[in-house]
């Protein structure tokens, strides 16, 4: 779903550390009662919240009513964009500059050392020249597949 009007996202405040248990209980309860809970999300970077996608707030209330670890009865309504920010992993992009030596940590050239030729931040790519004595070549690879080497 891409932010359509037929369903909303509701953030439920729960006991920190009990998010997965609460999500499991909500899923079982929704299945047993025939509630229209479309998805259940346990955000990896935020403790104490479970996000439900549902059309009717009454279904959210019925799914969470009487649950031991639910702290607030009234859920927070979230926008699709806010949910995506919580769910998408943040990739830490290393600060690279031309001439710097890096190690390739993934892909076909994993484990090889290379020298940075060009960095394209907008595309998330780096062009490198491999420093292996038997395999001299240049390659353009994703920037998250390299890490700077301490010299």
Curated annotation (Swiss-Prot):
The record's listing under Gene3D superfamilies reads: 2.30.30.30, NusG, N-terminal domain (3.30.70.940)
Q: Name one GO molecular function term.
A: translation elongation factor activity
Name the Pfam families on file: KOW, Spt5-NGN
Coiled coil ranges: none
Any one GO BP annotation for this protein: regulation of DNA-templated transcription
Under SMART domains, the record lists: KOW, NGN
Listed A to Z, the keywords are:
Transcription, Transcription regulation
Ranges for domain KOW: 98-128
* InterPro entries referenced in this protein's UniProt entry, alphabetically: KOW, NGN-domain, NGN-like_dom, NGN_dom_sf, Rib_uL2_dom2, Spt5_arc, Translation_prot_SH3-like_sf
Job description of the protein: Stimulates transcription elongation.
Spell out the HAMAP family in the cross-references: Spt5_arch
Q: Subunit notes for this chain? A: Heterodimer composed of Spt4 and Spt5. Interacts with RNA polymerase (RNAP).
Q: Which family does the similarity line name?
A: Belongs to the archaeal Spt5 family.
Q: What is this protein called?
A: Transcription elongation factor Spt5
Organism of this sequence: Aeropyrum pernix (strain ATCC 700893 / DSM 11879 / JCM 9820 / NBRC 100138 / K1)
Gene name linked to the record = spt5
């Amino acid at each position: 779903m891409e932010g359509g009007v037929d369903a909303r996202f509701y953030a439920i405040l729960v006991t920190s550390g009990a998010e997965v248990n609460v999500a499991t209980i909500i899923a079982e309860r929704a299945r047993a009662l025939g509630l229209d809970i479309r998805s259940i999300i346990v955000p990896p970077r935020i403790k104490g919240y479970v996000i439900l996608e549902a059309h009717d707030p009454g279904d959210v209330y019925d799914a969470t009513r009487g649950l031991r670890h639910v702290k607030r009865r009234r859920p927070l309504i979230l926008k699709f964009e806010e949910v995506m920010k919580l769910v998408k992993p943040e990739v830490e992009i290393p600060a690279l500059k031309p001439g710097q030596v890096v190690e390739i940590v993934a892909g076909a050239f994993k484990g090889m050392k290379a020298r940075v030729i060009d960095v394209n931040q907008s595309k998330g790519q780096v062009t490198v020249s491999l420093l292996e004595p038997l395999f001299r070549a240049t390659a353009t690879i994703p920037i998250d597949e390299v890490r700077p080497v301490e010299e």
